[in-house]
Amino acid sequence: MILVIDVGNTNCTVGVYEKQKLLKHWRMTTDRHRTSDELGMTVLNFFSYANLTPSDIQGIIISSVVPPIMHAMETMCVRYFNIRPLIVGPGIKTGLNLKVDNPREIGSDRIVNAVAASEEYGTPVIVVDFGTATTFCYIDESGVYQGGAIAPGIMISTEALYNRAAKLPRVDIAESNQIIGKSTVASMQAGIFYGFVGQCEGIIAEIKKQSNASPVVVATGGLARMITEKSSAVDILDPFLTLKGLELLYRRNKPTTEK
């Protein structure tokens, strides 16, 4: 079995794979102040609930966009699983040709998603990840990662609206069926929701126009379902795209990481 860990700015997603099949998955809040023991106890609690033990795990791979938490994560893997994890970063075999100014700047989550989407759905492909930031990545018909766009995520924008507009309340992010709100809260929710649907459709359309291609569009991330249910611009919703990419990258790099 393989343990895959995706460390995002808001949440960490943990999954267990066996023979390329996702058996279990969990989510925990990303807290950069957590110790390795706190992380270990959380993961072991997940395992206990699923009748798994640390000895079931033969390898671990981690993707992280939160550098301060990585020392604790790596220590946790060694202390509780006796495994030195594979870290997605420079030197890892991805199978992608990165045609960008500085490949080291690309977030590991974007690389992982691009690997998974290219393998699972073919190229050309656009990957939209609705996370803390909303990211758009374009991989052309030759499998070349051409770059993309990064926009503030839904939660960031919602909090900014509350923090910078004195008379506007904090609101929950919710799907809205009416663009014309009848109250301040309803108007904010409509603006936030339809604003991000429009952002998604507009950026996808512009990528298609500038690339002169007809890529398949794959969406992932915690808020992807809510947005994509209102948008015809997305072809495929894959909530486990990042975990799939991690498992695939582990197999591509397995000879140097398995215990």
Curated annotation (Swiss-Prot):
Binding sites annotated in the UniProt record for substrate: G107, S108, D109, R110, T184
Protein name: Type III pantothenate kinase
E.C. number(s) listed in UniProt: 2.7.1.33
GO molecular function: ATP binding; metal ion binding; pantothenate kinase activity
Task of the protein: Catalyzes the phosphorylation of pantothenate (Pan), the first step in CoA biosynthesis.
Binding site for ATP: D6, V7, G8, N9, T10, N11, C12, T13, T132
Entries under InterPro entries matching the protein: ATPase_NBD (IPR043129), Type_III_PanK (IPR004619)
Record carries keyword Cytoplasm: yes
The keyword Signal is assigned to this record: no
UniProt enzyme class: transferase
Cofactor: NH4(+); K(+)
Subunit structure: Homodimer.
GO BP annotations, alphabetical order: coenzyme A biosynthetic process
Residue sites binding K(+) per the record: D129
Gene3D superfamilies: 3.30.420.40
Main location: cytoplasm
Manner of cofactor binding, per the entry note: A monovalent cation. Ammonium or potassium.
Pfam families associated with the record: Pan_kinase
Gene Ontology terms: cellular component: cytoplasm
Taxonomic superkingdom: Bacteria
Native source organism of the sequence: Listeria monocytogenes serotype 4a (strain HCC23)
